[in-house]
């Protein structure tokens, strides 16, 4: 039996990648429109070379809570690259109706991670 792989800490010098978390509380009657907006807005995230991946997750216990997780190549790539692009303007137009539902929107740096292939 082999030894389980241990998470390896990452430091700023190892990777400038940042993860943006956006937490939403969306009223039930708007949840479908929210998911549709992000489905369409995802096209503009995918078009950006600064966006590495994204996901939209819905709360199991509280289905009106959503977390949008976006991995960016760097904080600068997000704020100076994507946010100044035509893709951002198209993206924001789609998600703008839900800005008032945001509870948190911040960048985080991964310090430790592990996963299975």
Mark where each language-model region is.
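Residue-level signal for secondary-structure boundary sites
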Residues: 32, 76-78, 113-115
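Short, well-ordered beta-strand segments in beta-rich or mixed alpha/beta enzyme
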Residues: 18-25, 55-83
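An amphipathic, aromatic/His-enriched active-site/gating alpha helix that lines ligand/cofactor pockets
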Residues: 40-52, 71-106
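Glycine-rich beta-strand-turn "strand-cap" elements at beta-sheet edges
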Residues: 2-18, 55-67, 92-117
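Short, surface-exposed ligand-recognition loops at beta-strand->loop->(often short) alpha-helix junctions
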Residues: 25-35
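Short alpha-helical
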Residues: 29, 40, 61-63, 86
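Intrinsic disorder/low-complexity segments
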Residues: 5-8, 32, 87
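Short, intrinsically disordered, low-complexity terminal segments
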Residues: 1-2, 34, 38
């Amino acid at each position: 039996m082999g030894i389980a792989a241990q998470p390896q800490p990452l430091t700023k010098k190892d990777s400038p990648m940042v993860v943006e978390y956006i937490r939403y509380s969306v009223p039930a009657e708007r949840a479908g429109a929210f998911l549709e907006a992000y489905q369409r807005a995802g096209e503009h995230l995918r078009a950006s070379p600064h966006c590495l991946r994204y996901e939209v997750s819905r709360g199991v216990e509280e289905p009106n809570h959503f977390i949008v997780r976006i991995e960016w190549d760097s904080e600068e790539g997000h704020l100076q690259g994507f946010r100044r692009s035509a893709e951002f303007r198209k993206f924001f137009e789609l998600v703008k109706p839900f800005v008032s539902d945001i509870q948190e929107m911040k960048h985080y740096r991964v310090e430790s991670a592990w996963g299975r292939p």
